[in-house]
Amino acid sequence: RAVGVATALVSDTGVEDYVAAIAADYQHVRDVREGKGQSALLSLADARANAFVADMSDKPMPPEQPGLHVFDDWDLADLAEVIDWTPFFRAWELAGNFPAILTDEVVGESATALWADAQAMLKRIIDEKWFTARGVVGLWPCRREGDDVIVHVPLHPEQMPAFAGEEWTARTHGVTASLPGDQFGLDGDFHHVRLPFLRQQIAKREGRANMCLADFIDHDGDWIGGFAVGIHGLEPHLERFRADKDDYSDILAKALADRFAEAFAERLHRHVRTTLWGYAPGEQLTNEALIREEYRGIRPAPGYPACPEHSLKQILFDLLDAGNSAGLTLTENFAMLPTAAVSGFYFGHPDSQYFGVARVGEEQLQDYAVRRGVDTDTARRWLRPNLD
């Protein structure tokens, strides 16, 4: 698509028609949006009164191995086994599910040629070790406080044997003071870090809850996890392709790095469920079942529908010490570097599920700013895509 766009923009004869077509498309989008109107919003109090109620008698057990776990060089061949190829083809604007897309009457020939090229490069990536897969997992005690989850991070690593690094610094994330853990049924001294989540406010049909991720955490004590993974080593190969003016290989390598990052997130989540947290030790799922998410628990990512506010990545990265643990950093707008990276939270309750927060109102915006510890203008900028 990028090649076609660039060609149209540099064309002496086609650029005006192309720009006019784009303008017409966007005007159509505006007209449709204005015609549809917007769904009614509940007050924040009413939305909270209609919260999802999870059965806390079925909450997950404490982790077998709490704390931080660092993975410096996960086997690329292992990750290749769980790659979900359907999004790979969509990235090339080839519509269809893998492997059926390879025999599709319309795009099958193009998809098959692309698949062959991808497999050839994939083999080189693994054999020549182009990439290094680095990641970190954290599993912490926590509790729910309204629409927030308060994460308890030990002040001293020896309180949680798997916890890595020196004394952890809470920074400024709407954190309470460092308090004795016994206030929350914990041994030792802990930082208490606030994770503010957003609640659905759009009026629902009877029997449908206005959900928030905090609904899956017990007020009386629970556990939450976090992770961040990244694929390192891509850039030198991109430089080589650019020097050779090989745009195709450049794009192909980027697409495969993204697939490795997603596969790493999938593989690590399974390791958490079966071993580190261990609430599903006997899990035996096929790759297809993993893609369909037929497992217990979710891993919502900041910036995605259930957790749309990107700045929570900064709290997550600080909790994980992601820079030192996995070589991952954030830009000022909370984009992850390297770009082939995935991060998110782990919820283990069997009732936990994905949903979209969608539109929220001014009342929740102001409430969120207080809970997040920022001024309203900053919160408004962060939440703009979800505002009324």
Predicted regions and their residues:
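Active-site loops and adjacent core secondary-structure elements that bind or stabilize anionic groups
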Residues: V3-I251, A255, T274-L276, L285
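C-terminal accessory domains/tails appended to large, multi-domain proteins
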Residues: W168, L186, R205-D388
